[in-house]
């Protein structure tokens, strides 16, 4: 399964792209064997964004059923989305758009205004609406594309 970071600042969400994807997605990645979801999201944030962030709370456990746009591969993905606190980091100093390199991959990051999400090519699609009303507790949901 996977974990993703929901990082918000001034009604903007941090999204990313890489050389393999034409769409935006949220920072995160796969949970390793014997790793907790909480440790995994903090590790992924450290690897991708080079910061030590804090978890505020889990938001969603999403079952996603989709066909990956680039490879055409079918997925049934479980992902836990965490709200992340970056207030004690230097992330905002990197600007509205910035590029970081993780191992051999280049990641382009952008702060996208909530209102702009409707017109963006971003996954998961549910984030376009759910970002306006974050849950106070973990919500189970599914998304079929």
How does the language model describe each region?
Residues 1-26, 54, 86:
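N-terminal strand-loop-strand
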Residues 5, 58, 80-84:
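A structural signal for short, well-ordered beta-strand segments
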Residues 7, 83-85, 111-113:
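Short, well-ordered beta-strand micro-motif
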Residues 8, 26, 53, 75-81, ...:
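Short connector loops at helix/strand junctions that flank enzyme active sites
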Residues 19-24, 90-93, 97-145:
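Nudix hydrolase/Nudix homology domain
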Residues 23-24, 62-68:
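Short, solvent-exposed loop/turn segments at secondary-structure junctions
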Residues 26-60:
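The catalytic Nudix box helix
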Residues 66-95, 130:
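Active-site-adjacent beta-strand/loop module that shapes the phosphate/pyrophosphate-binding cleft
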């Amino acid at each position: 399964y996977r974990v993703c970071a929901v990082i918000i600042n001034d009604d903007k969400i941090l999204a990313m792209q890489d050389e393999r994807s034409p769409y935006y997605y949220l920072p995160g990645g796969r949970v390793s064997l014997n790793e907790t979801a909480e440790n995994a999201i903090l590790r992924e944030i450290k690897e991708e964004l080079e910061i030590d962030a804090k978890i505020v709370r889990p938001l969603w456990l999403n079952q996603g059923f989709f066909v990956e746009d680039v490879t055409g591969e079918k997925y049934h993905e479980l992902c836990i989305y965490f709200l992340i606190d970056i207030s004690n980091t230097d992330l905002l100093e990197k600007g509205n758009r910035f590029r970081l390199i993780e191992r051999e991959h280049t990641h382009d990051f952008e702060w996208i205004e909530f209102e702009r999400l409707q017109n963006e090519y971003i996954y998961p699609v549910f984030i376009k609406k759910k970002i306006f009303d974050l849950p106070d507790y973990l919500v189970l949901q599914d998304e079929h594309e």
